[in-house]
Every structure is written in C-alpha cells, then in structure tokens.
Amino acid sequence: MAERTFIMVKPDGVQRNLIGEIVARFEKKGFQLVGAKLMQVSRELAEQHYAEHKERPFFGELVDFITSGPVFAMVWEGENVIAAARQMMGKTNPQEAAPGTIRGDFGLTVGKNVIHGSDSPQSAKREISLFFKEEELVSYSKQINAWLY
C-alpha cells in the first residue's frame, strides 16, 4: 500500500534554484506528487515543526533559518516513499552524505542542507497536517503505476 511523506525544500534550496531538480528526482523514482506550495513559514509554524528540538541548543537557529525565506513544501505518495526519500536525501551532514544523494550533491553544511523529509509514518502524518489542509492534497491515479508496482 502506498504511503505519504512530507518533503520540504529549505530556504537555501529555494534560493539556489533547486526545486525543479529535487522534484525531478522524486518523479524519476516513480513517486506521485499530491500536494505542493511555495510558502513563507511563520515563526509559530516553525516552532511547531521543530517542537521535538525545543530544548536543544540549536533550536533558535533552526527556527531562524527556516523562516529566513520561502520554502517549497510537498507531499509525495508511493510504495515505501518515507524510507526511499530518506535514502535519496542522504545523511543530514552533507559532508557525510554519499555522492548522488540530494545533500551529497547540493548540501553545504548541516544547517544549510537543502531539504527536509519525514523520518517515520508518525512524523509524516504530523508534518503533513501542519503544512497542508486535507483539501489541498489531490488523490489521483496514474497509468504508469501499473508499470511500477
């Protein structure tokens, strides 16, 4: 059964014109885009999104960075999309991320690593509901799915 994940191109990725490259990588893997929007993250939304890091020393920097410019928020659907997206993104630290991964190819530092993706079904559900209303997500079938699954 297909699952959904939340993927966000962070402000550094938007500024560096990487949205199209990132969308293309997910499409080429056969995943289906069901929601997307360019948006400015409010401080309140950023604090909710990063709530699990609230007590960490870098929390303020996370919030400041994610609110520093527009992000491109997306919901992708497909078989094992959460695990596959994590693999496609690469390690959080771009210096440790393998070449061919999004962070390995485009990330600069841990703080400017281009992309965020949900790390579990629970976080995917939470993050999707933070950034999207249900009516903003579009379910549809593609003929190519028969060739992929």
UniProtKB/Swiss-Prot annotation:
Keywords: ATP-binding, Cytoplasm, Kinase, Magnesium, Metal-binding, Nucleotide metabolism, Nucleotide-binding, Phosphoprotein, Transferase. It comes from the Bacteria. SUPFAM superfamilies: Nucleoside diphosphate kinase, NDK. CDD domains: NDPk_I. The active site is at H116 (pros-phosphohistidine intermediate). ATP binds at K10, F58, R86, T92, R103, N113. Its EC number is 2.7.4.6. Its cofactor is Mg(2+). Signal peptide: none annotated. Belongs to the NDK family. HAMAP family: NDP_kinase. Homotetramer. This is Nucleoside diphosphate kinase. It comes from Geobacillus kaustophilus (strain HTA426).
